[in-house]
Amino acid sequence: MLKKEIKAILEKSKQWGWVLEPDAQKIFSLYGFKTPKYGVTTEARQAISMAHQIGYPVVAKIVSPAVVHKSDVKGVVVGIKDDETLVRTLERLSKIDGFAGMLIAEMVKGLELIIGAKNDFQFGPMVLLGMGGVGVEIYKDVSLRMAPLKERDADHMIQELTARKLLTGYRSSEPINMSALKKTIVNFSKLMMDLQDI
């Protein structure tokens, strides 16, 4: 059943060449990953209702099959604290090419990491860990491994990051939960193994 629902999402996504964020959130939720509270809408009244359920401040992101990098079109707005700003954001995002909705999510504090994957034709599923955010393509601070992974593999990936000191609490920043990060990497590798034939 789980695979059937995920397979349907991935089949739908082939037309764009990537999975839209709400669909990715759905896959992660189905697979037991903890995700931020979120909702998707095209209507102002519903956006306000969702934001109140989630609790301000919220993040708003464009959902569009025509937009791969949301930040390139100013399609991500963080720290929205009130209904008026939320509605203005919806109005602006709705004018961007291919607008299919606005994702509203809870603000999550902390360091941004990227965990990604590619199904290599020779090696099968490859898992990537790196420093996230808009600088991911500039800094190229990443580590790669073939799936499936064990926790020791995840630990080696973390140790290979140049900016790994940020993860352990650099200066006044809080350290991240390394155990949770390793488990997330391992579980993500299992997801990639399960989906490699889809």
Predicted features along the sequence, with ranges:
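ATP-dependent carboxylate/acyl-activation modules
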Residues: 1-198
